[in-house]
């Protein structure tokens, strides 16, 4: 029966052609022809397969386990192919599905199509078919059913499925196992054979994410490489873990590639497959393909990328324009160049072989990356100009290649005429007109002529000048590619004619005209033109001189006096000095004054040493200082000097100010006669005595002090009459005039009767405590005894006297505005006197003064409110007093050493910067400075309190000695005091006294009242110190104005007759000075106002 089936099959196949076709499509046949068969343990069995082509078997065991399985082919007369499978000794391992199939139908992707039979081999000791270890891992897709393959060797054996929770209900098929939907975890199959229980090892169910479609992405970091570089390609699968991926690439056969897998689970599942090909060569060029297949389903996806490998880098330049380009003037145009290059190139532009300097608004370049190896560079002309013409070159270069492309750019410019001139041919009367024009393209030149000058405004009067006209020659030639010159020559011009040059090109035209004048008229025009030019030059010169004259700084008195203040405190009325009365008692006869050498000279005036005869009864001959203006002084400066005189008469006398002695205001230049101060200004005195001070204070070593700006070693060779240093100009240059300019001064012999000078020795250390001192020691502070040199107590004495002098000015509502050591003089007896020395100081060349508009300001001495808000008060003078203290205790140093007056200086002052303690100041003195430098003016001490503070630092007897000297001064017949009295009726400033003693007592009592009212605290906005104002008339700066009538030149001396009248007295006075050991030459060299 087993052999009849093939015979019938063959016979059926031969019946008709249709049957034959069906036969080709039919499956092979298996004998026995059953779906399943049970075979006894250890018995043998055989299976035969018949087919029309070659057939093969597929069975449960692997080739390693199939030693007792034999397969052979048999011949068959019917033409069929027969394959026999024989098992000699059946065991439980032989249980499974046996399949016969055609060889040509075997593929890797699909299941075999053939005939099947399932064989059972029951074994009482083996309930379940043996499995490989991988079979115990059950992979389940999301929520899909799965099979746990616990197959039995006997189809009749009952089986149950268990997990950690117990029996799991599921359908069971002895050929497959349990089929169902299982959660993740271990499962065990349990069977009972003849009362004996069998269990499998655990089946582990594992769930993998899988989708019905594959999301595959392929990426290559680069698609172009050079030999030797590493190719890297990646493929990524998203949201699927059951994937099989295969690479296909040129180097696959050689196994050159290295593959890696990376699983990324955050934020979603991603499998990244990386292919790396090191040391790439040209042969590695080609398609790189990755194919992904889902392991549990028939889902496939494929991606590919083309990689090219070059032997070395390359550059290709493809411009989108020609080598000659034109652009219209003011046109916007872009020039684009395409570049292919690897490695990435550096792209630059050149103009005329020079690196192109981009103008932010007119020409720019940029580079844009289009693709991996494609770039686009643009040259942008925003508004083309004529100078943009030239040769432009783009250069692209990398490590392996350099390529460039050059094109010429022409900016097309409308025609313009550069020049139109006529050349004369002398007496022959011939004239040539030259017309130079430029433009791109090169313009054509056309000549036109108008013979009737009066009608040349009408275009019809102009005719084109032909080339071949008798006595007229035209020619044209080009200078370069954009400039052309045309000429027309007239053999003779007998009358005035007009000639027009017309230059034109494609972009525009321009014309220009000139007149040709006959030679007879030309000479007349030349003379008229010369006169006109000369007149213009004269007018311009006058304007320049007027401007220079107006910009020249003018002399202005610094002192100001308040007349009244508004109730709200915001408006101030100042005393107009010109409105003050001038008491004729101050007038001094000119013939009683003999002028000597110049002590100080400035931009506006000078101070001259003089001898006055008859100023006081006790001193018929007195050495004085005379202020005067220069002969070139303007009326406003004469008015300012007169204002200064009236203010001095208004203030009255004080020991610590330079007192007025008299004045000459009539029949000549204005002279102001003041006290003569023997030792000169305080700065010079401190410099001169610095070595003696340092010798008395060994803890203050002699070192080079930067604040002085000089070398102490050179002091022996320096003249102290010069107040400015040549190197830095810190102090005024007191230029000495020629000694023959004035009659030499005759000195007096007697000492001052109002300065009671006692000499005694004293010496105090730099750091000291207040102690009681002998009267003689105290008096030494107010004496001319220099045997002990300059001491610290001398510095404190100077400090105290300046405070008393400023206290007096404050009591008179007078603001100084220029308090500094250069404006403090030292008289005999070491008496300090405050003055305003601006007239005789060359402030325009003095570094201490900074130009602000038409004035100069001592910025380093000024308070912040004066610098920034133009506010001047007694409290701003307190700030300057603190700077003066710094000068004194640094022995004449310049404030803020090493700092220039600039924006940095102003910012530091605003931010609260203050100078450090000078080397020779005690902590108590420095504390005074700091109080004076408070940024809030109202928190600064008054001069009254400053006097008391400094007084406490001096010996106890000092004040008594000082007050005695001051009182003696007020009782004396000193001219400054005497002229305040009226001899006829013993009245003093409008108050009548019965006798001299009552007057003096009232004066002494008034001193304390005067001190208590010293701190006025007024805030005085003075408009003439605005940092940047234009120069204004003096009358605009005050509430009232007046004009002085004193305008005259300075006389250079007094009459000889006057000198002869005083000769006897003068000789006697000189003898007296010799007796006290005063050298008259020293007085001239070391003294000034």
Curated annotation (Swiss-Prot):
Keyword annotations: ATP-binding, Cell membrane, Cell projection, Chemotaxis, Developmental protein, Disease variant, Disulfide bond, Glycoprotein, Golgi apparatus, Host-virus interaction, Immunoglobulin domain, Kinase, Membrane, Nucleotide-binding, Phosphoprotein, Proto-oncogene, Receptor, Repeat, Signal, Transferase, Transmembrane, Transmembrane helix, Tyrosine-protein kinase, Ubl conjugation
Q: Which residues take part in binding ATP?
A: 599-607, 627
Q: How is it modified after translation?
A: N-glycosylated.
* Location(s), subcellular: Cell membrane; Cell projection, Cilium; Golgi apparatus
Which InterPro entries is this protein grouped with? Answer: Ig-like_dom, Ig-like_dom_sf, Ig-like_fold, Ig_I-set, Ig_sub, Ig_sub2, Kinase-like_dom_sf, PDGFRA
Where is the sequence biased in composition, kind Acidic residues? 1065-1089
Q: Give me the Extracellular side stretches, as residue ranges.
A: 24-528
Protein origin, superkingdom: Eukaryota
- Specify the Ig-like C2-type domain's residue ranges: 24-113, 117-201, 202-306, 319-410, 414-517
Q: What is any Pfam family matched here?
A: I-set
Outcome, altering residue 570 to R: In a hypereosinophilic syndrome sample; does not lead to constitutive kinase activation
Choose one Gene Ontology CC annotation of this protein and give it. Answer: nucleoplasm
Give start-end positions of Polar residues composition bias: 1041-1059
Q: What is this protein called?
A: Platelet-derived growth factor receptor alpha
Q: Which GO terms describe its molecular function?
A: ATP binding; phospholipase C activator activity; platelet-derived growth factor alpha-receptor activity; platelet-derived growth factor binding; platelet-derived growth factor receptor binding; protein homodimerization activity; protein kinase activity; protein-containing complex binding
Which GO terms of type biological process are on file?
A: adrenal gland development; cardiac myofibril assembly; cell activation; cell chemotaxis; cell migration; cell surface receptor protein tyrosine kinase signaling pathway; cellular response to amino acid stimulus; cellular response to reactive oxygen species
Which residues of this protein are annotated with the site description Breakpoint for interstitial deletion to form the FIP1L1-PDGFRA fusion protein? 578-579
Question: Per its UniProt record, which disorder involves this protein?
Answer: A chromosomal aberration involving PDGFRA is found in some cases of hypereosinophilic syndrome. Interstitial chromosomal deletion del(4)(q12q12) causes the fusion of FIP1L1 and PDGFRA (FIP1L1-PDGFRA). Mutations that cause overexpression and/or constitutive activation of PDGFRA may be a cause of hypereosinophilic syndrome.
Q: Which residue pairs form cystines in this protein?
A: 49-100, 150-189, 235-290, 435-501
Summarizing the function annotation, the protein's role is:
Tyrosine-protein kinase that acts as a cell-surface receptor for PDGFA, PDGFB and PDGFC and plays an essential role in the regulation of embryonic development, cell proliferation, survival and chemotaxis. Depending on the context, promotes or inhibits cell proliferation and cell migration. Plays an important role in the differentiation of bone marrow-derived mesenchymal stem cells. Required for normal skeleton development and cephalic closure during embryonic development.
């Amino acid at each position: 029966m087993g052999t009849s089936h093939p015979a019938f099959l063959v016979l059926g196949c031969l019946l008709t052609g249709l049957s034959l076709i069906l036969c080709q499509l039919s499956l092979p046949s298996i004998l026995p022809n059953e779906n399943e068969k049970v075979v006894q343990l250890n018995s043998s069995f055989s299976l035969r397969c018949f087919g029309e082509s070659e057939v093969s078997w597929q069975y449960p065991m692997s080739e390693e386990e199939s030693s007792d399985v034999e397969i052979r082919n048999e011949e068959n007369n019917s033409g069929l192919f027969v394959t026999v499978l024989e098992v000699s000794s059946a065991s439980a391992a032989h249980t499974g599905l046996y399949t016969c199939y055609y060889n040509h139908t075997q593929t890797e992707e699909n299941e075999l199509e053939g005939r099947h039979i399932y064989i059972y081999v029951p074994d009482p000791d083996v309930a379940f078919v043996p499995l490989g270890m991988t079979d115990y891992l059950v992979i389940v897709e999301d929520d899909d059913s799965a099979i746990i393959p616990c197959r039995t060797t006997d189809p009749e054996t009952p089986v149950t499925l268990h997990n950690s929770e117990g029996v799991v209900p599921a359908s069971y098929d002895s050929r497959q196992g349990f089929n169902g939907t299982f959660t993740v975890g271990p499962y065990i199959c349990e069977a009972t054979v003849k009362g004996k229980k069998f269990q499998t090892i655990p089946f582990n169910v594992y769930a993998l994410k899988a989708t019905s479609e594959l999301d595959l992405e392929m990426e290559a970091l680069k698609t172009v490489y050079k030999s030797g570089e590493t190719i890297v390609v990646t493929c990524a699968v998203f949201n699927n873990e059951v994937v099989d991926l295969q690479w296909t690439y040129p180097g696959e056969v050689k196994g050159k590639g290295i593959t890696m897998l990376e699983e990324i689970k955050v934020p979603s599942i991603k499998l990244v497959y990386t292919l790396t090909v090191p040391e790439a060569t040209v042969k590695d060029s080609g398609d790189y393909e990755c194919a992904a297949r889902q392991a549990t389903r028939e889902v496939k996806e494929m991606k590919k990328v083309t990689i090219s490998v070059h032997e070395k880098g390359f550059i290709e330049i493809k411009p989108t324009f020609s080598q000659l380009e034109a652009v219209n003037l003011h046109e916007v145009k872009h020039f684009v160049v395409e570049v292919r290059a690897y490695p990435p190139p550096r792209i630059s532009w050149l103009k005329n072989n020079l690196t192109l300097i981009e103008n932010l608004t007119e020409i720019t370049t940029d580079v844009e990356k289009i693709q991996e190896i494609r770039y686009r560079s643009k040259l942008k002309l925003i508004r083309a100009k004529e100078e943009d013409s030239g040769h432009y070159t783009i250069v692209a270069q990398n490590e392996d290649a350099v390529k460039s492309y050059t094109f010429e750019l022409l900016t097309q410019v409308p025609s313009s005429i550069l020049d139109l001139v006529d050349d004369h041919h002398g007496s022959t009367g011939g004239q040539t007109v030259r017309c130079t024009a430029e433009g791109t393209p090169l313009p054509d030149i056309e000549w036109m002529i108008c013979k009737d000058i009066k009608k040349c405004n009408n275009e019809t009067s102009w005719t084109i000048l032909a080339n071949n006209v008798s006595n007229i020659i035209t020619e044209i030639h080009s200078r370069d590619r954009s400039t052309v010159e045309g000429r027309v020559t007239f053999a003779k011009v007998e009358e005035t004619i007009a000639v027009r040059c017309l230059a034109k090109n494609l972009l525009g035209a321009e014309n220009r005209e000139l007149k040709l004048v006959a030679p007879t008229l030309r000479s007349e025009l030349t003379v008229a033109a010369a006169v006109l030019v000369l007149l213009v030059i004269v007018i311009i010169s006058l304007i320049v001189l007027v401007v220079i004259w107006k910009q020249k700084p003018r002399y202005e008195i610094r002192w100001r006096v308040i007349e009244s203040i508004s109730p709200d405190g915001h408006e101030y009325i100042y005393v107009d000095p010109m409105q003050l009365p001038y008491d004729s008692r101050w007038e001094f006869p000119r013939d009683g004054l003999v002028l000597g050498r110049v002590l100080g000279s400035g931009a506006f005036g000078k101070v001259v040493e003089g001898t006055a005869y008859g100023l006081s009864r006790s001193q018929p001959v007195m050495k004085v200082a005379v202020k005067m203006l220069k002969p070139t002084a303007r009326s406003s400066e004469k008015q300012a000097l007169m204002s200064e005189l009236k203010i001095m008469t208004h203030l009255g006398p004080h020991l610590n100010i330079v007192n007025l002695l008299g004045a000459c205001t009539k029949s000549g230049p204005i002279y102001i006669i003041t006290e003569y101060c023997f030792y000169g200004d305080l700065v010079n005195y401190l410099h001169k005595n610095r070595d003696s001070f340092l010798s008395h204070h060994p803890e203050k070593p002699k070192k080079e002090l930067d604040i002085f700006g000089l070398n102490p070693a050179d002091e022996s060779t320096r003249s102290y009459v010069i107040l400015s240093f040549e190197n830095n100009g810190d102090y005024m240059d007191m230029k000495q005039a020629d000694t023959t300019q004035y009659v030499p001064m005759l000195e007096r012999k007697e000492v001052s009767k109002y300065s009671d000078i006692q000499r005694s020795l004293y010496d105090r250390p730099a750091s000291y405590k207040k102690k009681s001192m002998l009267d003689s020691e105290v008096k030494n502070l107010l004496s001319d005894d220099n045997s002990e040199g300059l001491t610290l107590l001398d510095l404190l004495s100077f400090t105290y006297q300046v405070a008393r002098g400023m206290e007096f000015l404050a009591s008179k509502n007078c603001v100084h505005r220029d308090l500094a050591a250069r404006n403090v003089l030292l008289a005999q007896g070491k008496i300090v006197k405050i003055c305003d020395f601006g007239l005789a100081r060359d402030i325009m060349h003095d570094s201490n003064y900074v130009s602000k508009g038409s004035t100069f300001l001592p910025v380093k001495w000024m308070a912040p409110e004066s610098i920034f808000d133009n506010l001047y008060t007694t409290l701003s003078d307190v700030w300057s007093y603190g700077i003066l203290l710094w000068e004194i205790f640094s022995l004449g140093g310049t404030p803020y050493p090493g700092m220039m007056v600039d924006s940095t200086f102003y910012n530091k002052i605003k931010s609260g910067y203050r100078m450090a303690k000078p080397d020779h100041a005690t902590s108590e003195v420095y504390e005074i400075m700091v109080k004076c430098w408070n940024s809030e003016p109202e928190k600064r001490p008054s001069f009254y309190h400053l006097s008391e503070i400094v007084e406490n630092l001096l010996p106890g007897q000092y004040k008594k000695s000082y007050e005695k000297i001051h009182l003696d001064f007020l009782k004396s017949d000193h001219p400054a005091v005497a002229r305040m009295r009226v001899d006829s009726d013993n009245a003093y400033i409008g108050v009548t006294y019965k006798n001299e003693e009552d007057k003096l007592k009232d004066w002494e009592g008034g001193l304390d009242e005067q001190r208590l009212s010293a701190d006025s605290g007024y805030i005085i906005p003075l408009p003439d110190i605005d940092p940047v104002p234009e120069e204004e008339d003096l009358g605009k700066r005050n509430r009232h104005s007046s004009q002085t009538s004193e305008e005259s030149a300075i006389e250079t001396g007094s009459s000889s007759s006057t000198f002869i009248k005083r000769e006897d007295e003068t000789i006697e006075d000189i003898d007296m000075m010799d007796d006290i050991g005063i050298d008259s030459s020293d007085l001239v060299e070391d003294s000034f106002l």
